Amino acid sequence: MNLIDKIAKDKSGLFSSGKGIVTFLNPYSYLVARKNTTLYESFDSIFADGALLSAMLTLLSGRTQRISFDFTSIAQDVFEYARSHDLDVFVVGSTQENVSKSVGVFRERFPGLIISGSRDGYFDSLSRQVFIKEMVQVQPKIIIVGMGAPLQEVLLKDLKLAGWEGLGFTCGGFLHQTAKFEGDYYPSVMDKLNLRWLYRMYDEPKLIKRYVISYPIFLVYFCVDALSSKLKRLFFKS
């Protein structure tokens, strides 16, 4: 699988079926995905999370929206969709303290939103099996998972394979960001200038190493994948 060919250009039709699993790639998780192609093939939708990946894809194959799971992007749509259709949401990830604070923010921000449950993202093998079995039994309509790549993707895939039939989203660090700032994480000026990456380095200095090391590597592999995609279309077009 060539990841470039799997990334959607926009969010049209996202809620049309009411089920499926959705994830998001930034330059760092793009490298993770390249090592786990079988895992990412199982996803119904993959979006470009971040201005750099979105810009690279736009240059390669036409305008590609930046779509991420936060309040500057698709999170607002997901919660509004759930509320307007009376769909229950289960939230899993981060620490118990953070997920509880996040749920409080969601309920305050979206009055009437049905949150049927939440739990932290730390499992042992037994508790993970119990959780998956419970989700299959109760069938929450939407599950949001914030455990970091690829753990969050593996959990959603396993839920789907076990028989859960709802709509699932990975959300990366969204839960702890929401808990920390009680709502919007990015200052509006940083969002408008597409400097969210810079703000994240300021807020979480541990990410500096990731940006400095991973992003140049991403550019190399993206160019390799872009060439592969172009050659595939050239020689195997119908």
Can you describe what each PLM-predicted range is?
Residues M1-D70:
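N-terminal nucleotide/polyanion-binding subdomain common to many enzyme families
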Residues I46-A48, I67-S68, G112-S118, G163-G172:
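Short hydrophobic/aromatic-enriched beta-strand-loop microsegments
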Residues K19, L87, G163-L167:
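A short helix->loop->beta-strand "cap" motif at the edges of active sites that frequently abuts
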Residues G121-D124, W164-M201:
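Short, flexible loop segments at boundaries between secondary-structure elements
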Residues M135, Q139-I144, G148-A149:
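Proline-aspartate-enriched helix->loop->beta-strand connector
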Residues S54, T58-E134, V138-Q139:
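Conserved beta-alpha
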Residues P27-S29, L52, M147-L151, F174:
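Short glycine-rich anion-binding loops that position phosphate/pyrophosphate groups of nucleotides
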Residues S54-M56, L60, Y185, V189-S238:
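A transmembrane-helix-recognition feature enriched in membrane-embedded lipid enzymes
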